[in-house]
Amino acid sequence: MTAIFLMSVLFGLACGQAMSFCIPTEYMMHVERKECAYCLTINTTICAGYCMTRDFNGKLFLPKFALSQDVCTYRDFMYKTVEIPGCPHHVTPYFSYPVAVSCKCGKCDTDYSDCIQEAVKMNYCTKPQKPHVVGLSI
């Protein structure tokens, strides 16, 4: 029985390493415009996780396309639009953001993803907050 248990654990670990863990994950972002009176807190989903990848030793001898690595990216997504409260009439109060429906491990597509790692940007409010809850008016 101990051998069966040990084999089950080893099999589980092997499968866990072979599978990628790239899934839609809850994310909270804060949106504000300098002309508007309020900051909006939005709950959305983004793609996050780990993808199996390899780093080749002979990089000098490979073509450039063979050097790209898989990233956790959108398989399917949709855009939602919200209205930032407290904006003057001359300012467009609408803000659109992506919502991850499903994710995949694949090449980064610059048509809809930022494929470089930037410095951490501000993700907090400097103005009074107005939380945005889908389907409810607060």
From Swiss-Prot:
Report the locations given in the UniProt record.
Secreted
* MF GO annotations: hormone activity
Q: Which residues form the propeptide?
A: 133-138
Q: Which residues are glycosylated?
A: 43
A GO term from the CC aspect? extracellular space
Which ranges of the sequence are coiled-coil? none
Q: Which Pfam families match?
A: Cys_knot
At the top level, the lineage of the source is Eukaryota
The record's keywords, sorted A to Z, are: Disulfide bond, Glycoprotein, Hormone, Secreted, Signal
Q: Which CDD domains match?
A: GHB_like
Q: How does it assemble?
A: Heterodimer of a common alpha chain and a unique beta chain which confers biological specificity to thyrotropin, lutropin, follitropin and gonadotropin.
Recorded family membership: Belongs to the glycoprotein hormones subunit beta family.
Q: What does this protein do?
A: Indispensable for the control of thyroid structure and metabolism.
- Protein name per its UniProtKB record: Thyrotropin subunit beta
Q: Which organism is it from?
A: Lama glama
